[in-house]
Regions:
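Conserved GNAT acetyl-CoA-binding A-motif
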Residues: 104, 111-122
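Conserved acetyl-CoA-binding loop-helix of GNAT-fold acetyltransferases
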Residues: 90, 96-109, 132-136
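Conserved beta-strand-loop-alpha-helix junction that forms the acyl-donor binding cleft
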Residues: 121-131, 147-151
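Conserved beta-hairpin
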Residues: 47-65
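A short beta-loop-alpha structural element at the N-terminal edge
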Residues: 2-16
Length: 160
């Protein structure tokens, strides 16, 4: 399987992958989010990466820019700028194979390449699967917050 930068011609397949996540446990995604606006934004910044298996898109991840998350007080000042990863999606037929971990590691490497000193993320406190995945990477729990009418943990990791 190969990870590569997404292209405009991948849009419909990525959107279909996003839609497959709706209704999954702990997934707050809807028919509106993520959608074409997020894909357009990510493509415009070369920030959307996909994993293919025999030509089929089986996973995706985005490098995110979110001023609301960046403005949280919990982030370590000496580790700025911090980058985010978002919209991690794995095709249901490929779940529980470690693909999300591979995508996150790839995203962390890309953030470092682009000059970010740290990774930071907000994760829904009820999303046990994501929390377990993040433990593998030894992300530090640095705070809690409420955003988008949901409770979140704030995680951070120095990129070195």
């Amino acid at each position: 399987m190969k990870i590569e930068l997404a292209r405009e011609e991948d849009r419909e397949e990525i959107l279909a992958l996003y839609r497959m996540q709706i209704g999954r446990e702990f997934c707050p995604w809807t028919e509106q989010y993520p959608g074409n606006d997020e894909i357009t934004f990510d493509l415009s910044r070369d920030a959307l990466f996909i994993m293919r298996d025999e030509g089929r898109i089986v996973a995706a991840i985005s490098l995110e820019e979110d001023p609301q998350v960046d403005a949280l007080e919990c982030w370590t000042k000496d580790l700025q700028p911090g980058g985010e990863l978002a919209r991690v999606a794995v095709h249901p037929d490929y779940q529980n194979r470690g693909l999300a971990r591979q995508m996150v590691q790839y995203g962390l490497d890309k953030l470092k390449e682009r000059g970010y000193r740290s990774f930071h993320a907000v994760v829904n406190r009820l999303n046990e699967k994501a929390i377990r995945s993040y433990a593998v990477f030894h992300f530090n729990l640095v705070g809690e917050c409420e955003m988008y009418d949901q409770p979140f943990y704030c995680y951070e990791k120095e990129l070195n």
